[in-house]
Each structure stands twice: as structure tokens, then as C-alpha cells.
A protein has these predicted regions:
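A short, hydrophobic beta-strand-centered structural micro-motif
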Residues: 52-55, 115-135
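C-terminal motif of bacterial Sec signal peptides marking the signal peptidase cleavage site
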Residues: 17-20
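Bacterial signal peptide processing site
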Residues: 22-25
Length: 205
């Protein structure tokens, strides 16, 4: 009887180990836009005098994927299957910029270019991401071209934004947070350029 019980117990242990080995690693999802704060709420409650559409956002083909990509050397990158963006990288960057620019321009309605609200936008901000690099436990860096146009296509301003942020410890959460800080800086640059632009009311279109 004891031998039978031992064999049965061993079989259960083996089955449990096999089940554990067969379980796929858990996927984790990250966002580049922080939770809405007081500044964003204040911007949303103000009466808009003009409107801004953020987008389109273009990213390099190698990064246009749901997985987080980290650099492993000068010529090698790793695609992390279990570390993923909550949406497409383009939409995550766009949403972070919508939130960041909107928080800094309380008198403007800021929305994503593909949204219904953006159809009558007085200004459009195109983003062309040239670099979006991360090194685990080190830093992230971005470089992007931005261009502001009026609704008639006339270019008002453009520039190239470059920034890097240390990640420190914290692995992938720290990478997402550092990217968020770089995009917050870019939001400030774009907002400053929009403040200098002549005010065009979307209501009069």
C-alpha cells in the first residue's frame, strides 16, 4: 500500500511539474501615457479657442510591432515577446503626445489625428520618429521630426527633437517610464511652437 501511495504521489508531482513547464510566460503590457493628472483635467475643462490634431505618427519598420524592442549591442536588438505595448507603438506615442500637449495648452482641443474630433482641427502635427532605442538597466533615447501645419497645408514650424533618459533599475517598467519622460519633453517643445503660432479657431471653418 505504501509503495502504491508513493508511486501515486510521484506521478502527481511529475504531472504538476510538466504542467508548470508547459505554461507560457505571462505577457505584460505597458503604456507610454501616464495616468491623467490635474493638469490634464484642467485642460479638458477649459473652453477651447482652437484645435490641434497630433498625427500621423510614423515609426521605423523595425519598431512597428507590439513587442518592446531593446538594444543588445551596436548591431543587435532583442524583440521581447512577453513585454508588449498596450496598443501599437504609433498609437502609444501619439496618445502620450496628445496628453502632454493638451495639458500644456488648456485653451486648445488636442486629439489624435485619426479621431472624429480631429477632422476640423486648425493645426496638424506630424511626427516622424527616427530613433526609439532602449538599453536595459541603462537608458532610452529618442529622435523625431515634428512638423506643424495649418488646415490648409501651410507649414508653420518644424524641428528635430532628441533626448535621452536614464532608466536605472526596474527593468521594463523603468524603460516605459523613461520613454514617457522623453515624450513629455517633446510635448513641451511642440506646445511652445503652437503658442507662437497665430490663433486659428476651428469654429470658424
Amino acid at each position: 500500500m505504501n509503495r502504491r501511495n508513493s508511486l501515486a504521489g510521484l506521478a502527481m508531482m511529475v504531472a504538476a511539474l510538466c504542467a508548470a513547464c508547459g505554461s507560457p510566460p505571462k505577457e505584460r503590457f505597458y503604456t507610454l501615457a501616464p495616468s491623467p493628472g490635474a493638469a490634464t483635467a484642467a485642460a479638458a475643462s477649459a473652453q477651447p479657442r482652437t484645435s490641434v490634431a497630433i498625427g500621423p505618427v510614423r515609426v521605423p519598420d523595425a519598431l512597428d510591432r507590439p513587442q518592446m524592442v531593446v538594444r543588445e549591442g551596436a548591431n543587435r536588438v532583442e524583440i521581447l515577446e512577453q513585454q508588449r505595448w498596450a496598443g501599437s507603438l504609433r498609437s502609444e506615442i501619439g496618445r502620450a503626445l496628445v496628453d502632454g500637449v493638451g495639458a500644456r495648452l488648456p485653451d486648445a482641443q488636442v486629439s489624435a489625428a485619426e479621431s472624429q474630433a480631429a477632422r476640423s482641427a486648425a493645426y496638424r502635427v506630424a511626427i516622424d520618429v527616427e530613433r526609439f532605442d532602449a538599453t536595459l538597466n541603462d537608458s532610452v533615447s529618442i529622435q523625431a521630426l515634428w512638423t506643424i501645419r495649418q488646415d490648409d497645408g501651410a507649414q508653420l514650424a518644424s524641428g528635430r527633437y532628441s533626448a535621452s533618459e536614464p532608466t536605472g533599475p526596474g527593468a521594463y517598467d523603468a524603460i516605459a517610464a523613461a520613454y514617457g519622460r522623453t515624450l513629455a519633453g517633446m510635448s513641451g517643445v511642440i506646445a511652445d511652437a503652437l503658442r507662437s503660432a497665430p490663433i486659428v479657431s476651428s469654429a470658424g471653418k
